[in-house]
C-alpha cells in the first residue's frame, strides 16, 4: 500500500472531492467513491475488496443528495454579476463539499471544516480560488453561526 493517503479526515475529504468531481463528469456514485479511495492502493489477486470509510461515503452521498440545495446556497452568496455556471467545476465541487460539511456535520466545528476545504482547494486549485472559497464559506459561517447545522 502506498503512503500517499492515510485514512485521516483530511485525506478522506480529498478523496470525497475526487469522487464528487468524477460524478460530475458522469461516473456513478459508488464506483467513483471506490475508485477515489482505492486507485493508489496496491492490491494483489488475493487482496480483499477495500471497505469504504463511512466518513467518505457520508460526504459523497450527502453532497450528491443535497446538490440542489447547496447550489442555491452558493448562488445566494455570490457577488452580483456572478452565477454558479461561471464557476469552474473544481471550485463548485469544493464549495459544495465544504458547505455540506459545515451545514450538516455537527461533529465538525464550522471553522475546522472551512480550514480543511481550503487546504484541499490549495492542492487542486490556485491561490485565487482558495481565497474565493474561503471568502464565500466564511461569509456563510458568519451570517448564522448557530443556525448553520440542520
Curated annotation (Swiss-Prot):
<dbReference type="GO" id="GO:0003723">
    <property type="term" value="F:RNA binding"/>
</dbReference>
<dbReference type="InterPro" id="IPR006027">
    <property type="entry name" value="NusB_RsmB_TIM44"/>
</dbReference>
<protein>
    <recommendedName>
        <fullName>Transcription antitermination protein NusB</fullName>
    </recommendedName>
</protein>
<keyword id="KW-0889">Transcription antitermination</keyword>
<dbReference type="Pfam" id="PF01029">
    <property type="entry name" value="NusB"/>
</dbReference>
<comment type="function">
    <text>Involved in transcription antitermination. Required for transcription of ribosomal RNA (rRNA) genes. Binds specifically to the boxA antiterminator sequence of the ribosomal RNA (rrn) operons.</text>
</comment>
<keyword id="KW-0694">RNA-binding</keyword>
<comment type="similarity">
    <text>Belongs to the NusB family.</text>
</comment>
<keyword id="KW-0805">Transcription regulation</keyword>
<dbReference type="InterPro" id="IPR035926">
    <property type="entry name" value="NusB-like_sf"/>
</dbReference>
<keyword id="KW-0804">Transcription</keyword>
<dbReference type="GO" id="GO:0031564">
    <property type="term" value="P:transcription antitermination"/>
</dbReference>
<dbReference type="InterPro" id="IPR011605">
    <property type="entry name" value="NusB_fam"/>
</dbReference>
<dbReference type="GO" id="GO:0006353">
    <property type="term" value="P:DNA-templated transcription termination"/>
</dbReference>
<dbReference type="GO" id="GO:0005829">
    <property type="term" value="C:cytosol"/>
</dbReference>
Amino acid at each position: 500500500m502506498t503512503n500517499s493517503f492515510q485514512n485521516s479526515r483530511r485525506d478522506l475529504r480529498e478523496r470525497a472531492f475526487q469522487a464528487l468531481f468524477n460524478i460530475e463528469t458522469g461516473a456513478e456514485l459508488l464506483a467513483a467513491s471506490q475508485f477515489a479511495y482505492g486507485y493508489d492502493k496496491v492490491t494483489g489477486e488475493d487482496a480483499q475488496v477495500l471497505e469504504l470509510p463511512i466518513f467518505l461515503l457520508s460526504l459523497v452521498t450527502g453532497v450528491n443528495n443535497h446538490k440542489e440545495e447547496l447550489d442555491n446556497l452558493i448562488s445566494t452568496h455570490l457577488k452580483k454579476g456572478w452565477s454558479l455556471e461561471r464557476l469552474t467545476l473544481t471550485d463548485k465541487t469544493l464549495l459544495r463539499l465544504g458547505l455540506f460539511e459545515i451545514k450538516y456535520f455537527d461533529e465538525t466545528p464550522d471553522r475546522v471544516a472551512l480550514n480543511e476545504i481550503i487546504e484541499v482547494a490549495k492542492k487542486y486549485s490556485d491561490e485565487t480560488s482558495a481565497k474565493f472559497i474561503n471568502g464565500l464559506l466564511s461569509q456563510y459561517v458568519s451570517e448564522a453561526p448557530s443556525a448553520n447545522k440542520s
